[in-house]
Amino acid sequence: RYWLPDDWQANVGAALDELARVTRLGGTLVVIETLGTGTDRAGPPSEPLAEYYAWLERARGFARQTIRTDYLFASVEEAARVTGFFFGPELATRVREQAWTRIPEFTGVWSRRR
C-alpha cells in the first residue's frame, strides 16, 4: 500500500473521529471515493481501496451509495487527452480504441448519522 502502509486505520480513524466531533448531533458524516473510472461496473479499483471501503462499512458504520458520475467530452481526442492526463496513458488508449466521448465513472458516497 502506498498511502499510510502500516497505520492507515489509526490515521483515517482519527480524521473520521474529528469529522464526527465537529458534526452536530443528528448531522451526517460523508466520505466520497472512487468506485472506478472507465469500467462498466462499480467496485473498488484496487485491493487496498477494497480493504478501506470494507473498513468504513464494517468497523465505522458507514453505508455506501453508488452513483454514476460519467465524464462527457466534445470529442474522443479531448476525452483521451484529459483522461490520459489524470488517469494515465492506459485509459487514454482505451478511450481512443472504444471511441468514447462519455467516460464511465462510478463514485461511492459513504454516509453515517451522528
Give the residues covered by each predicted segment.
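Conserved Class I S-adenosyl-L-methionine
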Residues: 58, 63-114
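Conserved class I S-adenosyl-L-methionine
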Residues: 27-58
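Short acidic/glycine-rich loop or secondary-structure boundary segments that cap or lie
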Residues: 3-5, 38-41, 73
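A short SAM/SAH-binding and catalytic strip from SAM-dependent methyltransferases
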Residues: 1-11, 35
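A short glycine-rich, Lys/Arg-flanked "PGG" loop and its adjoining helix->strand segment in the class I
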Residues: 9-26
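Structural element of the ATP-grasp superfamily
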Residues: 19, 53-57, 112
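Soluble or luminal CAZymes and related metallo-dependent hydrolases
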Residues: 11, 44-48, 104
